[in-house]
A protein has these predicted regions:
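Extended hydrophobic/aromatic segments used for targeting, binding, or gating
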Residues: 145, 162-169, 252-274
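A general structural motif
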Residues: 259-268, 285-291, 314-319
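Metal-cofactor-binding active-site regions of metalloenzymes
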Residues: 2-231, 236, 279, 295-400
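Active-site proximal loops enriched in glycine and acidic residues that flank catalytic Cys/His/Asp
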Residues: 242-248, 283-287, 308-310, 337-341
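Acidic, glycine-rich loop-and-beta core segments that form the ion-binding/anion-interacting portion
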Residues: 215-268
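Aromatic-lined glycan-binding groove of carbohydrate-active enzymes
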Residues: 240, 284-300
Length: 400
């Protein structure tokens, strides 16, 4: 095919995206919905960079308003220094995509221009070619769960997932909330399952999720509630999503910006897949050290699907390396990316950056088989890209 590179890029940029893991909330849920340039600058990626780049007083910084913090971050990371990190480049991509001239301007000037755009979440979805996003919803947070008490928001765009970390980390709180909602139960396990039935009916989640460090992963199958939860997930035909390798509060003073990487033994992931072959397992690992083994495991377990480049893995140099590895070992049988966005505007840069990398990687693979006399067509490329950005997620979540 002539103009292969241009064809791949065009198809990728025109394909609708299913974003399988975010922390977004609809605009109607104002307490939790985050949007705008101030929220983008106040994200913990940039806060951690600020703390380690300057000698700023951390406690005083956290007492400031969002706008005051944003001003400091803009001055320190974008005006006094070259904004060359991936987190900084993300901000520049958003501003550039929205045609905001940011050079030599203060935060207040940029904020003023940004606010004039008055972007809705639906407009950002359109800019980013996002068809649907999966939220992260904690059924053991009463305030957050109010989202499902009044569904005056687009339930087709925003899909639910159940974040179950509190069952492992804050059991007494979970049991108290379950008891407030369930009158009759046989034992604690029955209580939890009946509560999960209730929140399932309220939210219609597409998967349940857990974020685990290595100790939690090793003890996962020994937890007395896990067998019943996995059986419940099987009955509901929804996967379990495992985010593996976070080490919380590496630096407690940094608060949300203080989490780091834990060493993971993926033997225990393989055991979960073996012991529960009828449960679908989504998995993303935080450390580069785990990516090769994780990819090999995805070749060995039919019920395991890799997704995305999570958090510290979401760096262009690492994405290029591991994206090639996954294609070489798995073909197109994986979910290449999720945004992990907490601020709606982050969708713009997260997906622009990834699509550029995906385009280059796919072109090289297509060009390689074309040299070997395989005739690739635009229809095939379009089908492949749709699988990667949309259909693989839909199929694994039983939504298609």
């Amino acid at each position: 095919m002539k103009n292969l590179k241009q064809a791949v890029s065009k198809i990728i940029n025109e394909t609708e995206i299913f974003d399988i893991h975010t922390h977004l909330f609809p605009a109607e849920f104002k307490k939790y919905h985050l949007s705008g340039i101030s929220e983008v600058l106040n994200y913990h990626y940039l806060i951690a960079e600020l703390f380690t780049t300057t000698n700023i007083n951390i406690k005083k910084f956290y007492k400031l308003t969002n706008e005051e913090r944003s001003n400091i971050i803009w001055e320190e990371l974008f005006r006094k220094r070259t904004p060359i990190s991936e987190a900084c480049k993300g901000v520049l991509t958003i501003l550039s995509e929205l045609s905001i001239d940011y050079m030599s301007k203060s935060f207040d000037e940029i904020q003023s221009e940004y606010c004039k755009l008055n972007l809705s979440d639906q407009q950002i979805f359109k800019i980013s070619k996002i068809s649907q996003v999966v939220m992260t919803n904690n059924p053991f947070d009463k305030s957050e769960w109010k989202l499902f008490k009044n569904k005056n928001w687009d339930t087709n765009k925003y899909l639910a997932s159940l974040r179950l970390d509190d069952i492992l980390m804050n059991l007494e709180k979970c049991l108290d909330i379950c008891k407030e909602n369930i009158d009759r139960f046989d034992d604690e396990s029955d209580l939890i399952i009946k509560y999960l039935d209730k929140v399932y009916e309220e939210s219609r989640p597409v998967y349940a999720a857990l974020s685990l460090n290595n100790l939690q992963l090793k003890s996962f199958l020994k937890n007395k509630f896990i067998p019943d939860i996995l059986k419940w997930l099987e009955r509901k035909h929804i996967p379990l999503s495992l985010l593996l390798g976070v080490r919380r509060k590496v630096n407690k003073d940094f608060l949300l910006a203080g989490d780091g990487i834990d060493k993971i033994d993926l033997y225990y992931l393989s055991e979960i897949c073996n012991q529960y072959p009828n449960n679908k397992i989504l998995c993303s690992c935080l450390s580069l050290n785990d990516q090769h083994e994780l990819t090999v495991l995805a070749r060995k377990h039919q019920n395991l699907k890799i997704f995305g480049f999570w958090w510290f893995m979401n760096q262009p140099s690492l994405i290029k390396l591991i994206l090639n590895l996954r294609i070489e070992l798995l073909g197109l049988n994986f979910i290449p990316q999720h945004s992990d966005a907490r601020v709606t505007d982050q969708l713009i840069y997260k997906w622009i950056h990834f699509k550029t990398l995906l385009s280059n990687v796919l072109f090289n693979h297509y060009n390689n088989i074309q040299i070997k006399n395989f005739k690739i067509s635009e229809n095939q490329i379009s089908d492949d890209v749709s699988k990667l950005l949309y259909n693989n997620s839909q199929n694994f979540l039983n939504l298609s």
